[in-house]
């Protein structure tokens, strides 16, 4: 669908009749400068702690595979391994246990055990029907832990799974919190689930929080706690090395210095990549994706804040044709942006066959930015359909995930390239969640800057409803889109590697994290600052 307004909605705007006083985003300087990043020291770098870590890992494997454990004990151990952030060390053991449970399990009489089994099996790609809950949910309303785990399991639902609707479990959990004599450990988990469900949370931040929570539990396993703390700190040290590398690259580009109107958010851009893939062996992935994020943020501000419409048309033409002749009439800092992007693509695409896919993704992004610029300069308020058709591209998720595929896939699959170019549902639904979460978190600030209306304002204008009603509608759309993303994740008939699918899911999770308390990307709110400090700059003391 053509998402541009019809010609009568705006007249041609030329540089001569535009006010060339440049807009300002009023963005604050970065909180973390180059010298600070390079000065960070982490005691867990190198091999100093690896011997002890490997000993703990071997002991943990024995515990996981120990004979005689009951099904529920195994499920609880797997759940703890996942929430503590160390399950990636035991993938084969976990899949072996879950495969056995799927094949030989008998129905549990506990809502808690059933919900835990359902969630873990679905998370690992096993088909399990919602019918497993038949007759259980209505008869176990006094089992608060069971209701909590059913609530968490419900977020793995796909479209049409009415048995897993969250409304009545949420109501029960909110009522539970009003009681005075309640289990404080359960209450903390309930509070956290109602704030944001586990399935939507950023994995590494959840591990950071859960380690502190697990440490205080009476059933804590000291071996597992020590392993989780060591793993967190060792992985954090690897992340810091990645950050130092991209900080040097960012400084060398000169973009922050020469484009003062743009957001200088390198650490936040790196934070995104940890959310998408934190695994220590994916350092190159994080380094390249941080560059993608930094370039996206800068080019977005060129369109949103700096460029005139004529300049943006020329810039888009240059990107579309990858021809420097289009740059002649552009300001030097816009030329610098173009060359930084072109250099980056040529650096990443070691295989010439990859270049067209990367360029196509960037072209689509810039064309979507241009559509929004035309809406802005003409003061046009798009319909909700027009906005959404363009906005899932302009949020940049397709660019991020196209790069992610080439960083993960080895070898590249021809069928996957077709799905990649046409933005498979896995990409589309992840992008839509990112867009809607972004709109909920940023629309107020962006409207103050004079940006194009977001989904909230488009819906308010079209349906003549209040802002709160529009926000509630956007929250509902996010929930429905998660069901579609769950379905796309479960479908076996796609040629993408599992790690790519996980990255797409994690991008949606990262969106929920970054915009949970407002604009955590551009606005540098205290919540995001604290999360970055906890994840990157503060090691966990030994237990």
From Swiss-Prot:
Cysteine pairs bridged by disulfides in the record: none
Tissue specificity field: Confined to flowers.
Pathway: Secondary metabolite biosynthesis; terpenoid biosynthesis
Chain positions covered by the region annotation Disordered: 1-22
Matches recorded under InterPro entries: Isoprenoid_synthase_dom_sf (IPR008949), Terpene_cyclase-like_1_C (IPR034741), Terpene_cyclase_plant_C1 (IPR044814), Terpene_synth_N (IPR001906), Terpene_synth_N_sf (IPR036965), Terpene_synthase-like (IPR050148), Terpene_synthase_metal-bd (IPR005630), Terpenoid_cyclase/PrenylTrfase (IPR008930)
Main enzyme class: lyase
Any one cellular-component term (Gene Ontology): chloroplast
Purpose of the protein: Monoterpene synthase (TPS) involved in the biosynthesis of monoterpene natural products of the 'cineole cassette', volatile compounds present in floral scent. Catalyzes the conversion of (2E)-geranyl diphosphate (GPP) into alpha-terpineol and, as minor products, sabinene, beta-myrcene, limonene and 1,8-cineole.
Domain writeup: The Asp-Asp-Xaa-Xaa-Asp/Glu (DDXXD/E) motif is important for the catalytic activity, presumably through binding to Mg(2+).
Name by which UniProt lists this protein: Terpineol synthase, chloroplastic
The species this protein was found in: Nicotiana alata
């Amino acid at each position: 669908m053509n998402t541009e307004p019809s010609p009568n909605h705006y007249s041609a705007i030329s540089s001569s009749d535009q006010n060339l006083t440049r807009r300002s985003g009023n963005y604050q300087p970065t909180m973390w400068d180059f010298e600070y990043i390079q000065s960070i020291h982490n005691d867990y770098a190198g091999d100093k702690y690896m011997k002890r870590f490997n000993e703990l890992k071997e002991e943990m494997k024995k515990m996981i595979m120990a004979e005689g454990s009951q099904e529920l004990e195994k499920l609880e151990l797997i759940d703890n391994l996942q929430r503590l952030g160390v399950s990636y060390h035991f993938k084969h053991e976990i899949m072996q246990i879950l495969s056995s449970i799927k094949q030989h399990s008998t129905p549990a009489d506990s809502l808690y055990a059933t919900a835990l089994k359902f969630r873990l099996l679905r998370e690992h790609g096993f088909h399990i029907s919602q019918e497993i809950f038949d007759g259980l949910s209505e008869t176990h309303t006094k089992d608060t832990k069971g209701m909590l785990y059913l609530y968490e399991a419900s977020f793995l639902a796909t479209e049409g799974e009415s048995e897993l609707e969250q409304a009545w479990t949420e109501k029960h959990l909110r009522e539970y919190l009003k009681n005075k004599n309640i289990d404080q450990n359960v209450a903390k988990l309930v509070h956290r689930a109602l704030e944001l469900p586990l399935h939507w949370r950023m994995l590494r931040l959840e591990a950071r929080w859960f380690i502190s929570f697990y440490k205080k539990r009476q059933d804590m396993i000291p071996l597992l706690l020590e392993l989780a703390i060591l793993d967190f700190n060792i992985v954090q040290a690897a992340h810091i090395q990645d950050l130092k590398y991209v900080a040097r690259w960012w400084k060398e580009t000169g973009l922050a210095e020469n484009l003062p109107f743009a957001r200088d958010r390198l650490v936040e851009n790196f934070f995104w990549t940890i959310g998408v893939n934190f695994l220590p062996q994916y350092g190159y992935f994080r380094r390249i994706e941080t560059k993608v994020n930094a370039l996206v943020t800068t080019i977005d501000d060129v369109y949103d804040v700096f460029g005139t419409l004529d300049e943006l048309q020329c810039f888009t033409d240059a990107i579309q044709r990858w021809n420097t002749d289009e740059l002649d009439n552009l300001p030097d800092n816009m030329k610098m942006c173009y060359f930084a992007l072109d250099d980056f693509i040529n650096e990443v695409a070691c295989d010439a066959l990859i270049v067209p896919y990367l360029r196509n993704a960037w072209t689509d992004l810039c064309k979507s930015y241009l559509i929004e610029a035309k809406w802005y300069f003409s003061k046009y308020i798009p319909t909700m359909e027009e906005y959404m058709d363009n906005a899932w591209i302009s949020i940049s998720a397709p660019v991020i995930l196209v790069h992610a595929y080439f960083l993960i896939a080895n070898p590249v699959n021809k069928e996957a390239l077709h799905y990649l170019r046409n933005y498979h549902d896995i990409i589309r639904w992840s992008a839509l969640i990112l867009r809607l979460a972004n709109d909920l978190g940023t629309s107020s600030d962006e409207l103050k800057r004079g940006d194009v209306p977001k989904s909230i304002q488009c819906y308010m204008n079209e349906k003549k409803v209040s802002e709160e009603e529009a926000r509630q509608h956007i929250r509902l759309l996010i929930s429905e889109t998660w069901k579609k993303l769950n379905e796309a994740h479960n479908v076996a008939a796609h040629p993408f590697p599992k790690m790519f699918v996980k990255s797409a899911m994690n991008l949606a999770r990262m969106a929920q994290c970054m915009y949970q308390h407002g604009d955590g990307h551009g606005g540098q709110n205290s919540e995001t600052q604290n999360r970055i400090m906890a994840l990157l700059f503060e090691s966990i003391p030994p237990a």
